[in-house]
Amino acid sequence: MMSYSERLGGPAVSPLPVRGRHMVHGATFAYVPSPQVLHRIPGTSTYAISSLSPVTLTEHSCPCGEVLECHDPLPTKLAQEEEQKPEPRLSQKLAQVGTKLLKVPLMLAFLYLFVCSLDVLSSAFQLAGGKVAGDIFKDNAILSNPVAGLVVGILVTVLVQSSSTSTSIIVSMVSSGLLEVSSAIPIIMGSNIGTSVTNTIVALMQAGDRTDFRRAFAGATVHDCFNWLSVLVLLPLEAATGYLHHVTGLVVASFNIRGGRDAPDLLKVITEPFTRLIIQLDKSVITSIAVGDESLRNHSLIRIWCHPDTTEASTSMSRVEAIGSLANTTMEKCNHIFVDTGLPDLAVGLILLAGSLVVLCTCLILLVKMLNSLLKGQVMSSRRSSTQTDFPAPFTWVTGYFAMVVGASMTFVVQSSSVFTSAITPLIGLGVISIERAYPLTLGSNIGTTTTAILAALASPREKLSSSFQIALCHFFFNISGILLWYPLPCTRLPIRMAKALGKRTAKYRWFAVLYLLVCFLLLPSLVFGISMAGWQAMVGVGTPFGALLAFVVLVNVLQSRSPGHLPKWLQTWDFLPRWMHSLQPLDGLITRATLCYARPEPRSPQLPPRVFLEELPPATPSPRLALPAHHNATRL
C-alpha cells in the first residue's frame, strides 16, 4: 500500500518532528497539507472550515499561536469541475452560447422590474404614511431642536422610502419661509441616513447562504456606517459652529446663480410608462400639509384627473393651484389600476407594499441565480481582478476616487442612490465586487444624488432660489465632509471595518439583520425623538452617561484586540459579566427554541455543508488517512 507521502509524489515524511538532523522522539502527529494539495490526491476530500483552533505542542518546543484561516472551497471546486468535464461537442457549445445569450435579455427584464418595484414601493410608503410625514414636518417648534430634526429626517425618509421626496418637502418649507436653513440642515442629515435602509432590505434576500449573506450585508451596511459616523461628527460641529450653514451661505453669495432647467428624468423616461399604469400620486398634497395648507387634509394622494399633455404639471404646486391653472384646458381621467377603486389611501398603500415586495424579492432572487450561472466560471477571476485593477504604482491611490466618479455618474444617470446601491448589493454578495471597491462606489453614489438635488433647486423661482440652492448645497457639503473624514487615509476607513463586523455577526445570527433594521431605523430614532421632546436637559442627562459608556466599551474592545497587556487582567475579556451582556448566544437560543418549538425534529444527514462555521461543527472524528493522536489537542479537519 502506498504511503501518504508517496501518493503526493514527494519524499517520505517522517511522522515525528525533526530538529536539525536528529529526530525528536515523542508522540506522533501528522503534518496537515493545504486543501489545494488534498484535492490533487485521489480518494481524499476536505471540508471548508472558517477558523482553526490553536495548536500548541510544548513538549516539542513548537508553540503555535492562534491561527485564523478562511478556506473558500470555491476555487478548487471550480477547478475540479473544469478538469472533470469532457470536451463539449459543437452542438453543445452552440446550445451553451444560445442559453447565455437568452439569459442576458431576461436579466435586463428582471432588472427593469426590480427598478420599477422600487418605484412602486416608494409610492406605497407614501400612501401609507405620507400625510403623517407632512404632519411631522409641520411642527416647526420640534424641528428647531437639531437632534429632533435629525430623527424626523430619518423617520420621514424611512416612511416615504425616498430621500428625494423628503428633501423636496424641506426645500418647499425653506423657500416658503416656514423653516430656517439652519433648522433644516439636521433634517437633511437624517434623510441621508434614512435612504440607506433600502439596500439593507435588499441584502436580506441573500440570507440563504451564510457567506453570500455576510458579504451582501456588509456591503449594504457600509453606507449606514458612513452616514452614522458622519452625523456623529458633523451634527455637534454644526450645532456649535454652524459650519455647513456658513460655508454654503458664502458659496451662494459668491456666485450669481440663476434658475435653470429641471433635473433630467433619465431613468423615469424608461420606468414611468410601466409604473404609471399601476399608480399615480399627487405628491403636492404632502407638501401642502407640511407648509400648513389644511384645505387638502381630506384629499387623496391618488391622482384621479390628469392633463393629457403634461401629466406632471401640478407636481410642484398644490392641487387647488393646479386646478385653477388648468381650468381652461381639457382634463381626463388618469389611466392606472386604482383610479376608480374608491379604496382609501392606506388600503391601496398596503396592497402596493405587499405586491412590490413580492416582485422585488422574486426579481432579486432570479437575478442572483442568473448571475451565478453566467459568472460561475469567472467569479474567482473577477474577484481577483477587482482587487488588482488599480492604477499604476505612483497613482494607485487614484483608484478609489475614480470609483467615486463612477458611482456619482451612475447615480446621476438613474437619479436614485437607492437604486444604484441596491443594484450592486447582489454583486457584493456574489463576491464580484469587494467591499473595498463598494465603499468608494457608495460614497460616489451619495455625491451623485446631491447633484440631482442641486439641479432641481436651480429650477426654483428666482425669489426662492437662494434658500433652496443653499439647502441642496448643505446636502452636497455634508457628504463631501464625510468623505474627507472617513476615506482619504486607510486608517480612517472605519465604515469598512464596522460593516465587516456587522456582516460576520449577521452571518452567524441571521435574525440579527432584522433586529439591526428595527433598532437603527425605528426604535433608536423614536427613543431619541421622545427624549428630545422633554427638552435639552433630558437629552444631556440621558445622552451624556450613555455616550460615556459607549465610548468606554469601544475603547476597551479596541485595547482587548490590539493591546490587551495595557488592561487589567480582569478587563482583558468580558467574561466577568453575565453571558447575556456580552454574547448573543443566549438570545439566539431563545429565538431558536421559540421558532422551532412546534417543529417536528427530523433526522439530519451527517454530511457537512460546503461552508460551515467553527461554532456549528459537530465533534470531529479522526480521518483514516490523517490519523491524529487522541490525547493531543490538535486541529480538527
UniProtKB/Swiss-Prot annotation:
Residues 126-145, 186-345, 435-464, 533-537 are extracellular. Coiled coil: none annotated. The keyword Methyltransferase does not apply. It is found in: Apical cell membrane; Cell membrane. The keyword Ligase does not apply. It catalyses: 3 Na(+)(out) + phosphate(out) = 3 Na(+)(in) + phosphate(in). Keywords: Cell membrane, Disulfide bond, Glycoprotein, Ion transport, Membrane, Phosphoprotein, Sodium, Sodium transport, Symport, Transmembrane, Transmembrane helix, Transport. Belongs to the SLC34A transporter family. Induction: Up-regulated by low-phosphate diet. The gene is Slc34a1. NCBIfam families: 2a58 (TIGR01013), Na_Pi_symport (NF037997). This is Sodium-dependent phosphate transport protein 2A. The chain crosses the membrane at residues 104-125, 146-163, 166-185, 346-368, 411-434, 465-485, 512-532, 538-559.
